[in-house]
Regions:
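C-terminal trimerization/auto-chaperone modules of long, extracellular attachment fibers and adhesins
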Residues: 4, 10, 18-170
């Protein structure tokens, strides 16, 4: 009987512990992690490693994620492997829905955007950059040339140092 009571008590303790919020600097946390009136720092010493470890989580889901091994930040929702280790560029940033920033120091924001070129930026809906130092903004725009810019609706800047603006221009 004592063993049964002990097991029930331990079970209730674990159940209660899992349901509580954590507070740093507060005795009354309002969320799972609550740090009131303060800054938060996530850091790692030195430069990124030559062989980065796995991401904190992979696959589909909603998340906000700092991946220290690649100094990369992600926030939003993905439905597949967009934010898995091989689709995250060193020093990159991606936010929104179905975004991928796989290029070195690249940025992808919006819905279904992909920035695969080194230091490239893709913003909007269905935009893509594959050229180095390229920019795609708007709806379904593509900047594939080096240092190219595509802006507007369904524009493509495929030549190096090219610019395409407006609607359905190349």
């Amino acid at each position: 009987m004592k063993n049964l009571l002990f097991i029930i008590a331990i079970f209730l303790l674990v159940l209660n512990a899992q349901a509580q919020n954590v507070g740093i600097g507060t005795t009354n946390p309002l969320a799972r992690l609550h740090v009131p009136d303060s800054s938060i720092l996530f850091s790692a010493a030195g430069d990124i490693p030559a062989s980065p470890g796995n991401t904190p989580i992979s696959g589909a889901g909603r998340r906000m994620m700092w991946y220290a091994d690649k100094a990369a930040f992600r926030a939003g929702y993905v439905n597949g492997n967009q934010w898995d280790i091989y689709n995250i560029g060193n020093y990159s940033f991606a936010s929104g829905v179905y975004t991928t920033a796989s290029g070195y120091s690249s940025t992808a924001m919006g819905y279904g955007t992909t920035a695969s070129g080194s230091t490239s930026t893709a913003m909007g809906y269905g935009t893509a950059t594959s050229g180095s130092v390229s920019t795609a903004m708007g709806y379904s725009t593509t900047a594939s040339g080096t240092i190219s810019t595509a802006m507007g609706y369904s524009t493509t800047a495929s030549g190096n140092y090219s610019t395409a603006m407006g609607s359905s221009t190349t």
